[in-house]
Amino acid sequence: MSEAIIAKKAELVDVVAEKMKAAASIVVVDARGLTVEQDTVLRRELRGSEVEYKVIKNSILRRAAEKAGLEDLASVFVGPSAVAFSNEDVIAPAKILNDFAKNADALEIKGGAIEGAVASKEEILALATLPNREGLLSMLLSVLQAPVRNVALAVKAVADNKEDAA
């Protein structure tokens, strides 16, 4: 191989390793067998959630994972691999890919990484069942509001009782 090609591949490894380090979550899938139309729809959905989706050679992915400190992730880079990176939302790539896989038998989740820790296929699928960030925040808000609401109702009940007594 020429030195120019080797340098280009080394640069690609560095770029992918940086994406892996910066990613909140990484999901690796086997997208072999998807039609062009399905792939286009999937990419559009991922882009809409600010998830980067790339098909990258396994040798590049293995070297990048090693460089990013995710050596155990190398075991999923077998056969055709596509990788979804999300820097913001941990749940988005897993949720979108899992929902898409329900309708497209050709798409198979292989594994990934969550906030720098390697995750198995089962862990990625479990992550996909969680509500998105907005859903989790609304749940938290309702839990925080419940005690205040209960106190307000108790005060109102006491006030109503005093009005009735007077």
Curated annotation (Swiss-Prot):
Alphabetical UniProt keywords: Ribonucleoprotein, Ribosomal protein, RNA-binding, rRNA-binding
Keyword Iron-sulfur: no
Keyword Ribosomal protein attributed: yes
GO terms for cellular component: large ribosomal subunit
CDD domains: Ribosomal_L10 (cd05797)
Residue ranges of coiled coil: none
Pfam families linked: Ribosomal_L10
Alphabetical GO biological process terms: translation
GO molecular function per UniProt: large ribosomal subunit rRNA binding; structural constituent of ribosome
Role of this protein: Forms part of the ribosomal stalk, playing a central role in the interaction of the ribosome with GTP-bound translation factors.
Family of this protein: Belongs to the universal ribosomal protein uL10 family.
HAMAP family linked: Ribosomal_uL10
Subunit details: Part of the ribosomal stalk of the 50S ribosomal subunit. The N-terminus interacts with L11 and the large rRNA to form the base of the stalk. The C-terminus forms an elongated spine to which L12 dimers bind in a sequential fashion forming a multimeric L10(L12)X complex.
PANTHER family named among the record's database cross-references: 39S RIBOSOMAL PROTEIN L10, MITOCHONDRIAL
Name used for this protein in its record: Large ribosomal subunit protein uL10
Gene giving rise to this polypeptide: rplJ
